[in-house]
Amino acid sequence: MGIDAEQRGMVMLDIVAVPAFSDNYLWLVHDEASGDTAVVDPGDATPVLTDAEKRGWAITQVWNTHWHPDHTGGNQAIKAATGARISGPAGENIPGRDVALSEGDEVRLGEHVGRVVEVPGHTLGHIALIFDDDRVAFVGDTLFAMGCGRLFEGTAEQMYANMQRIAGLPEDVRIYCGH
């Protein structure tokens, strides 16, 4: 994991929660140095487009953790409005996906690098994005604010194993979930 972003003098990611529906969190992730902004799990395009515009941020990427509509429903509208590239799990049907992600792949936002970790349980193809140097993890619906995500496609054993993986992250990693 090496030297973290702050020690390298690298600008830290600016992460903003954008509430949607009754209990979703859509995440705007901005890199000041490059000017690039990603949206994590945009179930609805309007709130993230509005928030990004107010901040003067240009959305260049969409990162989906799984296929559920409350996490992908805004993909096409964001892509149409911004030209953003959409990345999501290879094993799932992600609307508008340009890049299929599997275990060990990477996503990049400026100089920030996130590794893709497959975390089946909530859905079979569910992924998490872990930015080791930034001490940030986007876990989608693997973890909710008050416990683990519901089991729709995976097994309790898979979910438990992935809870252990998340629990094994360094203590200072900030976890960003979808609900």
Give the predicted meaning of each segment:
Residues 21-23, 37, 44-118, 135:
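Active-site HxH/HxHxD metal-binding segment of metal-dependent hydrolases
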Residues 29, 41, 66, 78, ...:
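Divalent metal-coordination and catalytic microenvironments
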Residues 123-178:
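Metallo-beta-lactamase
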Residues 42-43, 89-90, 103-104, 140-141, ...:
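Fold-independent oxyanion-binding glycine-rich loops
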Residues 8-57, 129-140, 146:
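Conserved beta-strand hairpin/beta-sheet module of binuclear metal-dependent hydrolase folds
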